[in-house]
Amino acid sequence: KEITEAPESFQKTLRGKIVDVDGNLHVQLDESAFPADLKNQFRDGGFKEVYVIGQGTAAVAGSSLASLLSEEISIRVESLPSTELSGFRLRADMSDTLVIAISQSGTTTDTNRTVDLVRSRGASVISIVNRRDSELTKKSDGVLYTSDGRDIEMSVASTKAFYSQIAAGILLAITISDAINGPLNGQSNFERRNKLLLGLRELPDLMREVLSGQERISQIAAELAPAKKYWAIVGNGLNIV
């Protein structure tokens, strides 16, 4: 169930956030997710670094956000476990820092503790979370919900949560990039953005197509799994995640 509901959860995460303006696709997040004061701070050069944090699967999902965002903006972007930020990267004054905290439940102890520590030092926080009114949402300046923020049946295996966190992360990365760089210009930039967002919008149907081949997938797994002792999964760019 956690796997088969992934396309719907992914689609809910995107709903209403990708809009067509004059034939070009744009990301549109409301102020509850990306407040105007944070947008202005990015525009005015007030942020010098962005940390993307989480624990376990959420930290892995965060690496996709950091990878895309680091390609789009010139300020430093780093993805790391929450415990690493709280243990080794804190500064007395972090008012020039945005922390993006990712948590399915919004109650991840290490992540919430780290958020408390960075906020006490002046950092701003945007959270990507599934659970509405969870502890993390109350500690954040902005909240971007995965699914519709009401998907309480999330497995520890974290399949649909993981996919939805990646979707939300891409939307947020594009929004931050636009806040810093201003409106897109140049045909090549529009083409690149349209390709990314169109691909994102088409993914739920492609996921359903893959899941419809479950019987064939089982056959392939039964044939190959016993045949090899070591396996490697490789990729480049966003495909690393």
Q: Would you name each region that the model predicts?
A:
Residues 1, 6-51, 142-241:
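Active-site phosphate/pyrophosphate-binding segments
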Residues 36, 45-199:
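Glycine-rich phosphate-binding loops that contact phosphosugars or nucleotide phosphates
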